[in-house]
């Protein structure tokens, strides 16, 4: 599982380049969430070619775009399956069971939630 906080086009470009250097043409089960106030289009344009499937998950930050709205954006950039999940836990489980390498990206809030989950601390609500 790869965790990367790419939340803007510059970081997404570096992520995509590094993914290709490390994994070649391998596709990712992409666990994704992004803040509504970020350049989501710019990020999606760069990371969409990495996706074998998308797993859109909610996040504790109120700034995160809802999974339904995110699905509409992702489908404009990608023709692979886009699956919306009710929880981070179900999204991670589905991604792990996909047969693809798992890539979690799009938001530092998302990475914080994932790291808290892995540490057994759960997810903490944030006002940001």
Feature locations, PLM:
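C-terminal helical cap/extension that packs against the catalytic core
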Residues: 1, 44-101
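Nucleotide phosphate-binding/pyrophosphate-handling subdomain across enzymes
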Residues: 1-53
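Active-site catalytic pocket residues across diverse enzymes, especially alpha/beta-hydrolases
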Residues: 19, 23, 74, 118-122
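Short, flexible loop segments at boundaries between secondary-structure elements
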Residues: 60-63, 124-128
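Active-site-proximal loop/hinge segments that shape catalytic or ion-binding/gating pockets
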Residues: 107
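Short, active-site-adjacent cap segments at secondary-structure transitions
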Residues: 110-112
């Amino acid at each position: 599982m790869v965790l990367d906080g790419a939340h803007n086009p510059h970081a997404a470009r570096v992520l995509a380049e590094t993914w290709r250097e490390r994994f070649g043409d391998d596709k990712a089960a992409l666990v994704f969430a992004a803040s509504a106030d970020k350049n989501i289009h710019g990020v999606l344009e760069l990371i969409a070619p990495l996706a074998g499937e998308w797993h859109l998950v909610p996040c504790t930050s109120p700034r995160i775009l809802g999974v339904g709205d995110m699905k509409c954006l992702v489908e404009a950039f990608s023709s692979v399956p886009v699956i919306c999940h009710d929880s981070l836990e179900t999204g991670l489980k589905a991604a792990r069971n996909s047969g693809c390498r798992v890539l979690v990206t799009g938001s530092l809030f998302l990475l914080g939630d994932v790291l808290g989950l892995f540490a057994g601390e759960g997810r903490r609500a944030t006002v940001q």
